[in-house]
Design a protein with these regions (language model features):
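Aromatic-Pro/Gly-enriched surface loop or interdomain linker
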Residues: 1-62
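Active-site alpha/beta core segments
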Residues: 50-52, 59-60, 89, 109, ...
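Short, glycine/charged-enriched secondary-structure capping and boundary segments
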Residues: 19-22, 58-60, 80-84, 110-113
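Short alpha-beta junction capping motif
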Residues: 60-105
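An acidic, glycine-rich "communication" segment
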Residues: 102-120
């Protein structure tokens, strides 16, 4: 069984009726719905506004793959969480960055660059 955690800021759904209409359960909920239909996946979700951004140590320890959807609240992710995600990836957890997550704090920490589109 692959243990997947889908993380989403949850900001767009909260701020935009149009986005909320398309993703009534949030973007993370839509991804969970699709991935959860796979027989070999156990899927949970986490969002920025939850305690520990939904990713306390016990959740990360029980995650095989972390899917990270980010767009505009990158700076709101606490540095302590970034370090926990970084450590967990170094110990084997997969990390999939979606949408603008190339600019998320965990992805930048993992890549060791600014990850700006013009960084080179």
């Amino acid at each position: 069984m692959i243990r997947v955690t889908v993380w989403n800021e949850g900001v767009h759904e909260a701020e935009s009726r149009e986005v909320a209409a398309v993703y009534p359960e949030g973007i993370h909920g839509q991804l969970k719905s699709f991935l959860g239909a796979q027989e070999d996946m156990e899927v949970r979700t986490a969002t920025l506004r939850e305690p520990d951004c939904g990713l306390p140590p016990e959740v990360l320890e029980n995650t095989d793959v972390l899917i990270w959807w980010g767009h505009k609240a990158h700076d709101e992710v606490p540095d302590e969480l970034v370090e926990r995600v970084h450590d967990r990836v170094l110990r084997g957890m997969g990390f999939i960055a979606l949408h603008s997550a190339h600019f998320s704090k965990p992805f930048k920490r993992l890549m060791g660059t600014s990850c700006a589109l013009h960084w080179r």
